[in-house]
């Protein structure tokens, strides 16, 4: 009997024992910084001369690790291994696959602060953000294991007296997992284990700026008893290895989290039927957002300001769910804006090794340059009332930036920035606010701050996003509680951490026996 699922609790770092335990995790990670990590294909550890170099975005001089880089030849070898392994893995008992996830979750739970410390070093996450990332990785494994146990016997269908009918789920085949750098543990682990527990084999290509945490997760899967060849670790260039695997005729599905442009490119390439291919590939994609917090005139204005600041600047705004637009009723606009500026100026920005840092760096030089270019656009399209400065001398740091008085059709209101920049826009009334919120090609998350029940119900029906929150921020979905995924250009409408997510990695088979 499996106990009911509950999400992994977040660590309270105001408790001295927890603070000391996290500091020990940092020391442990510091003891192995700069190590080399191999590719893993069929259990074989392969070292290549060509390496992906991972550095600390808060301290560019600090080497986190060097990970061997796959070539097309090694990617082909991994595909052949995954394809062969699938023939046995697909017949493994769902209970056994679920047990491996439970064991992996237990291992990560024991090493929780170590994994979070890796995220501090490799992704530049403050303690609370790193802790939440690790907790979510645990949640995905615990939740998907239980979901597989629910789905293992299929779904009931009708049978006449003369027959016995069954509706079962069977795995798809070899999946290519292309995971993101912003949640390099949680999303990577969730995408991988969802595919594996469903009976598929996997080629895992992690983001090139955060491959070390993925290499460490491979150690966990091996310790948990996952057979060799089920997950094959093939870090590499997207243009070389990624394209090759997406195009490969033996690839059955691609699971991707990342930018809109790359997601569209994968979707287009996967749609093409290549020589030797006998199926239509499935694509599971989550591709970002342009997320809005709407503040009604009948709202808790202090809660509104706090929700905007937390959602805009948590992990430096580098969440696909981050608030990049605050649309506020004109009657309360000045009050909410001024309070948000006050709260933003209280935030501490720096190296997240320290406990009390609210905001760390952005991901890399490319991210820094992109965000600063939007800050420059903000100076033209609105008024910068907080932040606006960046410093890339030691790490890639950008001050949390509020741009006020932005027109609803401005670039800052349309284009995904993926950094600590939020645009404030006035709305004439609630209907106007919803119209502005929906005026985007994305549809991932949103929030409405209102004490008007009619307005809440109107937003519930008309605010077109996959995850809509009321009287709170627009980030922080919890596995199994708020299944996550959006509409339109935010992806393929999949819901990670939800009851139908595993079914995306399987196909239904009907059998009918005449009695």
Swiss-Prot record:
Active site positions, chain numbering: 286, 320
Reactions mediated catalytically: L-glutamate 5-semialdehyde + NAD(+) + H2O = L-glutamate + NADH + 2 H(+)
Family matches, as Gene3D superfamilies: Aldehyde Dehydrogenase, Chain A, domain 1 (3.40.605.10), Aldehyde Dehydrogenase, Chain A, domain 2 (3.40.309.10)
Enzyme kind, highest EC tier: oxidoreductase
Annotated pathway: Amino-acid degradation; L-proline degradation into L-glutamate; L-glutamate from L-proline: step 2/2
SUPFAM superfamilies documented for this protein: ALDH-like (SSF53720)
Matching InterPro entries: Ald_DH/histidinol_DH, Ald_DH_C, Ald_DH_CS_CYS, Ald_DH_CS_GLU, Ald_DH_N, Aldehyde_DH_dom, Proline_metab_enzyme, RocA
One cellular-component annotation, GO: cytoplasmic side of plasma membrane
Record-level Gene Ontology MF annotations: 1-pyrroline-5-carboxylate dehydrogenase activity
EC number, as in UniProt: 1.2.1.88
One Gene Ontology term from the biological process aspect of the record: proline catabolic process to glutamate
Record's keyword terms, sorted: NAD, Oxidoreductase
Family affiliation: Belongs to the aldehyde dehydrogenase family. RocA subfamily.
NCBIfam families per record: D1pyr5carbox2, PRK03137.1
Protein name per the record: 1-pyrroline-5-carboxylate dehydrogenase
Organism: Bacillus mycoides (strain KBAB4) (Bacillus weihenstephanensis)
Gene name of the encoded protein: rocA
């Amino acid at each position: 009997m499996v106990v009911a699922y509950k999400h992994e609790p977040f660590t309270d770092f105001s408790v001295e024992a927890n603070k000391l335990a996290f500091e020990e995790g940092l020391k442990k990670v510091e003891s192995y910084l700069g190590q080399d990590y191999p590719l893993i294909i069929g259990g074989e550890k392969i070292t290549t001369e060509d390496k992906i170099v991972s550095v600390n975005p808060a301290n560019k001089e600090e080497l986190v690790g060097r990970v061997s880089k796959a070539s097309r030849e090694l990617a082909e070898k991994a595909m052949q291994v995954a394809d062969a392994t699938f023939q046995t893995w697909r017949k493994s008992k769902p209970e056994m696959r679920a047990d491996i996830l439970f064991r992996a979750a237990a291992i990560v739970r024991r090493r929780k602060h170590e994994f979070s410390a890796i995220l501090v070093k490799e992704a530049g996450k403050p303690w609370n953000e790193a802790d939440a990332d690790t907790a979510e990785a645990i949640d995905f494994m615990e939740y998907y294991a239980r979901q597989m146990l629910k789905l293992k016997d299929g779904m009931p269908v009708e049978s006449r007296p003369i027959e016995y009918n069954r509706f079962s789920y069977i795995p798809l085949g070899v999946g290519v997992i292309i995971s993101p750098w912003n949640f390099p543990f949680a999303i990577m682990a969730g995408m991988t284990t969802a595919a594996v527990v469903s009976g598929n084999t996997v080629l895992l290509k992690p983001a090139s700026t955060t491959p070390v945490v993925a290499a460490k997760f491979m150690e966990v899967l091996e310790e948990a008893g996952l057979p060799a060849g089920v997950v094959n670790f093939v870090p590499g260039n997207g243009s070389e290895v990624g394209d090759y695997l997406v195009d490969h005729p033996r690839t059955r599905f691609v699971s991707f989290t990342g930018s809109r442009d790359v997601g569209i490119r994968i979707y287009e390439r996967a749609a093409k039927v290549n020589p030797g291919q006998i199926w239509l590939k499935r694509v599971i994609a989550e591709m970002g957002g342009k997320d809005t917090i709407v503040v009604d005139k009948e709202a808790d204005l202090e809660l509104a300001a706090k929700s905007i600041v937390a959602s805009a600047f948590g992990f430096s705004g580098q969440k696909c769910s981050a608030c990049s637009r605050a649309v506020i009723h004109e009657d309360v606009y000045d009050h909410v804006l001024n309070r948000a500026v006050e709260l933003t100026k209280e935030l501490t920005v720096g190296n997240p090794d320290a406990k009390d840092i609210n905001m760390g760096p952005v991901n890399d030089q490319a991210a820094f340059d992109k965000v600063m270019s939007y800050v420059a656009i903000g100076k033209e399209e609105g008024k910068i009332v907080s932040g606006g400065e960046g410093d890339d001398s030691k790490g890639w740091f950008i001050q949390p930036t509020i741009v006020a008085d932005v027109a609803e059709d401005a670039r800052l209101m349309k284009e995904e920035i993926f950094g600590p920049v939020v645009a404030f826009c006035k709305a004439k009334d609630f209907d106007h606010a919803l119209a502005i919120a929906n005026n985007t090609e994305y549809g991932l998350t949103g929030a409405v701050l209102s004490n008007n029940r009619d307005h809440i119900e109107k937003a519930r029906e008309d605010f077109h996003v996959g995850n809509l929150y009321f009287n709170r921020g627009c980030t922080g979905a919890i596995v199994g509680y708020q299944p996550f995924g959006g509409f339109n250009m935010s992806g393929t409408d999949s819901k990670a951490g939800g009851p139908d997510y595993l079914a995306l990695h399987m196909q239904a088979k009907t059998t009918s026996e005449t009695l």
